[in-house]
């Protein structure tokens, strides 16, 4: 699992130049095989959390994925909302914040190298995948793809 996450994050950042939100959505969709409508990816491009320095795109991407995946698995909206809230709480407890400007290793400076959050992205997507496996998949009785 970690090997695939690490490989895909690196590829999406350095070969595709995707944002953290889009990278999160794409990697999670590859792990769990839902069909994400192209408009979901298009909408995620507009979030671009890192440039606004508010809620981390790694959180936003996972919340978008939970909503989309949950609906595809016929999980009730109320349960999806509860799962998203629970994810936010657990992410904040684990990583210390939900805010991009607090999670980003070196803050925001013009001389920052590209994809400064690659290590954090790999950790956050692994955390998100574990959350989905433990909290959402048991509700759907599905197993994660290889």
Regions found by a protein language model. Name each.
Residues 80, 85-146:
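C-terminal binding/interaction regions
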Residues 24-44, 94-102:
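Acidic-glycine-rich active-site phosphate/pyrophosphate-binding loop
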Residues 7-15, 45-54, 74, 108-113:
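A short glycine/serine-rich beta->alpha loop
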Residues 31-42, 68-83:
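Phosphate-handling active-site elements
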Residues 61-69:
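DPxDG-like acidic metal-binding loop motif
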Residues 5-31:
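Active-site-proximal helix-loop elements at catalytic-domain edges
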Residues 41-43, 53-54, 74-76, 85, ...:
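Domain-level signature for proteins that mediate thiol-based redox and metal-cofactor handling
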